[in-house]
Amino acid sequence: MASLVAVQPAAVKGLSGSSISGRKLAVRPSSAAVSRSTRRARGAAVVAKYGEKSVYFDLDDIANTTGQWDLYGSDAPSPYNGLQSKFFNTFAAPFTKRGLLLKFLLIGGGSLVAYVSASASPDLLPIKKGPQLPPTPGPRGKI
């Protein structure tokens, strides 16, 4: 049986409006959990260094844990020339929406299937070609 253990909530900067800020979990441990905890040595604490045993979360260093979000935001002008930027802004704008892109792919795929089926020769299907060889008799001499 699993037992729940109540821990003290950690104050994390930036989570003041979060649902986990400052709420305590009121749980009474079961008698089996209490008896198990008395058998264990109480002097040892579980500690893992950053990166050791696949622990990569540090509440004291949130910026390095979650990543530098401001690193990739840039207000610099576009590295492309004006004509190229205008072309992509004009002709690629309809494909920024998922629905329009899906419609374009469906219409393009449907027209490709229609073209291939219209240009295919009609005698590709075996039912149109008919038998090519005389029938071979089976094990009892029957067709």
UniProtKB/Swiss-Prot annotation:
<keyword id="KW-1133">Transmembrane helix</keyword>
<dbReference type="GO" id="GO:0009535">
    <property type="term" value="C:chloroplast thylakoid membrane"/>
</dbReference>
<dbReference type="Pfam" id="PF03244">
    <property type="entry name" value="PSI_PsaH"/>
</dbReference>
<protein>
    <recommendedName>
        <fullName>Photosystem I reaction center subunit VI, chloroplastic</fullName>
    </recommendedName>
</protein>
<keyword id="KW-0812">Transmembrane</keyword>
<comment type="similarity">
    <text>Belongs to the psaH family.</text>
</comment>
<keyword id="KW-0150">Chloroplast</keyword>
<comment type="function">
    <text>Possible role could be the docking of the LHC I antenna complex to the core complex.</text>
</comment>
<dbReference type="GO" id="GO:0015979">
    <property type="term" value="P:photosynthesis"/>
</dbReference>
<keyword id="KW-0793">Thylakoid</keyword>
<feature type="transmembrane region" description="Helical">
    <location>
        <begin position="100"/>
        <end position="120"/>
    </location>
</feature>
<dbReference type="GO" id="GO:0009538">
    <property type="term" value="C:photosystem I reaction center"/>
</dbReference>
<keyword id="KW-0472">Membrane</keyword>
<keyword id="KW-0603">Photosystem I</keyword>
<keyword id="KW-0602">Photosynthesis</keyword>
<dbReference type="InterPro" id="IPR004928">
    <property type="entry name" value="PSI_PsaH"/>
</dbReference>
<keyword id="KW-0934">Plastid</keyword>
<keyword id="KW-0809">Transit peptide</keyword>
<feature type="transit peptide" description="Chloroplast">
    <location>
        <begin position="1"/>
        <end position="48"/>
    </location>
</feature>
